[in-house]
Structures are given as C-alpha cells and as structure tokens.
C-alpha cells in the first residue's frame, strides 16, 4: 500500500474498491458498438458497426450544478447520476443525435466507495434510459480542494446522426407549430435560486411536506430526476417531422427557444396551454419571484420544445400518444417584431 499517498489524504485502496463496486453497474449499459470493458486508458466504440452512411458525431458535456447540495442535504445520491446523463444526452438529442457513449467525472474530498457506488449506479441508470454505453470515467480524490463530504459530478456524451438528418432549426418557417414535452420537475437548473427561495427565505427543509406538493417531502420533489427525452424523440426523428428542438435548461424559455429559431422569426407561446407543475408555484411564492421572470429561469413544466410544420402537428401528437408520451401545443412561429419569445 502506498503509505505516503495515504498520509497525504488519498486512499488508493478506496479507489480500487470503487472500481470493483461499479463494474456491475457499468455492465448494464453495454450496447452495440461498445468494445471491451472499463480499465483501459481509453474507452472504445466501434462506429462502423452501426451502419451509418455519413455519420456526424455530436458531443455534449454538462454537470448538475448545485442540485448536488440538495442531494447532500437529503442524503440521497442514487438519482443524481441520472441528472448528469440527462443534461448531456438531451443536449445532443436536440440536434438529432443517437447517443452512443458516456463518460463521467467525479471529484471528491474523500473517496467513499459506498456513496460513489450510489452515484455511479444513477449514471448507469441514465445510460440505460438513453441507450448509451458507460465506457469510462474518472474518480479524483482531491483532499484540500473539497471537504471530505463533498463531491462534484460532470459528464460527457457522444452521439451520432446522419449528416442529412441533423436537426438544426434551419428549415423553421413562419406558421410552424411549437409542441412542448413535459418535464418531471425543476430538472437540473436554477438550484442556487431554488435553495435560496425554499431553504433561506421560506425556511423549509428537505423534509418539509407541503399540501401543494401532495404531501411529498420537498427534497424528494426537488431530486426527481431530469427526464431523458432520447426515446421520446427517436420515433419523431425517424418520421422526419421535427424541424428544431430546444432543450429547456438554464435560462428557461426565454434563452433556449431562440437557439433553434432562424433570424427574423420569433416564438409565440400561449400561456395556459400546458399544466405548470406545482413546484414552480411553490418556488414563485417562496422566493417572491416575478411570474414572467420564472420563464427566464426555469422550465416551468416543459423540458423540450419541438418545432414542426403545421401539416405535421397532428401526426406528431399522435406519434407521442402512441408511444405513451404527452405533448402540448404551445404556440407557433411568427415574424419577429419585438422579443425572441412572446409569452401571452
């Protein structure tokens, strides 16, 4: 055992224990194209085996921000990995990608094998939901950088799309219809404000039970994993009905919807066309946040916005329904005369 390293605060044995514990979770994510297992210097993936004619790789990286603080407060670490995967694969799926593989990065003050197994099990759960292989990762024990009970989590996803099938919003025109896919809650953005509003201003705890939330513990509601939209979007991409996709993350409707819309156009959104989840009403009240500002921060119950032609709107809704997914007609694309997003 490297005694000097141990005395410096880094446990090599704990690192070995983590690898041993997570192997079964990694194995669950195996999919066509994955070559070998973990333990090499790099993760391998055979792109040729998938049969793409003009493959374009699409990548994305993200973390879960201060949602980790809520996980720590609640002592619940088994789902935060799903959030990490979701934030990455939803971004690349918004460009039409089929996720292929994922790598995670965990930095911590002290290597706790049992806790890190919980985290990685969540990462594996997310990879299974997204049908992508967990082909590598890094766990960095960094005493002096983090407190012993602190850790951070980030990830990196790579997907592929046919060059001719990349979804970039360039074909969006006036009159196209905007369809919203529901979120599962706050997802993974805005948690610095969430914590300030609920825990500092309102004085709630993760164990607070509110009638507005059906009596469920506040911590459980906040830690509801970010929805992974890969399997929701796949049949829509195959049907060729989607012109553009906006993943509603940090910046809410106001910052994300314009990212898919060509210059000279704007999104007209009809308020009341979808059910706003109760957690957002609780946040707005607790933090005394202006109602319209909420749309510039949170997803407000809509995690993805799709742009489709008016002729394909009914077909899109039928495809969603046939796959057990919900969708809401939010509004349409209009000529830009003022703001990028019109909320009325």
Swiss-Prot record:
Q: Which cysteines are joined by disulfide bonds?
A: none
A Pfam family it matches: AIRS
* Entry EC no(s): 6.3.3.1
Pathway per its UniProt entry is: Purine metabolism; IMP biosynthesis via de novo pathway; 5-amino-1-(5-phospho-D-ribosyl)imidazole from N(2)-formyl-N(1)-(5-phospho-D-ribosyl)glycinamide: step 2/2
Sorted alphabetically, the Gene Ontology cellular component annotations on this record are:
cytosol
GO BP annotations listed? 'de novo' IMP biosynthetic process; adenine biosynthetic process
- What Gene3D superfamilies does UniProt report for this protein, alphabetically? PurM-like C-terminal domain, PurM-like, N-terminal domain
Lineage: superkingdom: Bacteria
Give the catalysed reaction(s), semicolon-separated: 2-formamido-N(1)-(5-O-phospho-beta-D-ribosyl)acetamidine + ATP = 5-amino-1-(5-phospho-beta-D-ribosyl)imidazole + ADP + phosphate + H(+)
Which CDD domains has this protein been placed in?
A: PurM
| SUPFAM superfamilies assigned to the protein according to its UniProt record, in alphabetical order | PurM C-terminal domain-like, PurM N-terminal domain-like
Task: Write out the entry's keywords from A to Z.
Answer: ATP-binding, Cytoplasm, Ligase, Nucleotide-binding, Purine biosynthesis
GO terms for molecular function, please? ATP binding; phosphoribosylamine-glycine ligase activity; phosphoribosylformylglycinamidine cyclo-ligase activity
Which subcellular locations apply to this protein?
A: Cytoplasm
PANTHER family the UniProt entry points to: TRIFUNCTIONAL PURINE BIOSYNTHETIC PROTEIN ADENOSINE-3, TRIFUNCTIONAL PURINE BIOSYNTHETIC PROTEIN ADENOSINE-3-RELATED
The entry assigns this protein to a family as follows: Belongs to the AIR synthase family.
Q: Which NCBIfam families match?
A: purM (TIGR00878)
The molecule here is called Phosphoribosylformylglycinamidine cyclo-ligase
Organism placement in taxonomy:
Bacteria, Bacillati, Actinomycetota, Actinomycetes, Bifidobacteriales
Gene that encodes the chain:
purM
């Amino acid at each position: 055992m490297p005694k000097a390293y141990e005395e410096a605060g880094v446990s090599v044995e704990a690192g070995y224990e983590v690898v041993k514990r997570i192997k079964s979770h990694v194995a669950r994510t195996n999919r066509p194209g994955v070559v070998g297992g973990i333990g090499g210097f790099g993760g391998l993936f055979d792109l040729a085996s998938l049969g793409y004619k003009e493959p374009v790789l699409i990548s994305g990286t993200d973390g879960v921000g201060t949602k980790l603080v809520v996980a720590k407060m609640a002592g619940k670490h088994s789902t935060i990995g799903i959030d990490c995967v979701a934030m990455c694969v939803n971004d690349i799926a918004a460009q039409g990608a089929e996720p292929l593989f994922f790598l995670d990065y965990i930095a911590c003050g002290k290597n706790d094998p049992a806790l890190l197994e919980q985290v990685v099990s969540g990462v594996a759960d997310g990879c299974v939901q997204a049908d992508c292989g967990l082909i590598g990762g890094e766990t960095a024990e960094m005493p002096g950088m983090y407190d012993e009970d602190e850790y951070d989590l980030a990830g990196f996803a790579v997907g592929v799309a046919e060059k001719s099938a990349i979804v970039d919003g360039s074909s969006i025109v006036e009159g196209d219809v905007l369809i919203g896919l529901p979120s599962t809650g706050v997802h993974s953005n805005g948690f610095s404000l969430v914590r300030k509003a609920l825990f500092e201003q309102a004085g709630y705890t993760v164990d607070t039970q509110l009638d507005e939330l059906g009596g469920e513990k506040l911590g459980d509601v906040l830690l509801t994993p970010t929805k992974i939209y890969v399997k929701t979007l796949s049949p829509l991409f195959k049907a060729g009905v989607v012109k553009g996709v906006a993943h509603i993350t940090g910046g809410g409707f106001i910052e994300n919807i314009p990212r898919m819309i060509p210059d000279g156009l704007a999104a007209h959104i009809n308020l009341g066309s979808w059910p706003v989840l109760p957690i957002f009403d609780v946040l707005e009240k607790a933090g005394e946040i202006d109602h319209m500002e909420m749309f510039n921060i949170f997803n407000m119950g809509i995690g993805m916005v799709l742009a489709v032609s008016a002729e394909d709107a009914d077909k899109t809704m039928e495809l969603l329904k046939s796959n057990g997914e919900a969708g809401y007609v939010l509004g349409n694309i209009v000529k830009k005369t003022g703001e990028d997003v019109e909320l009325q």
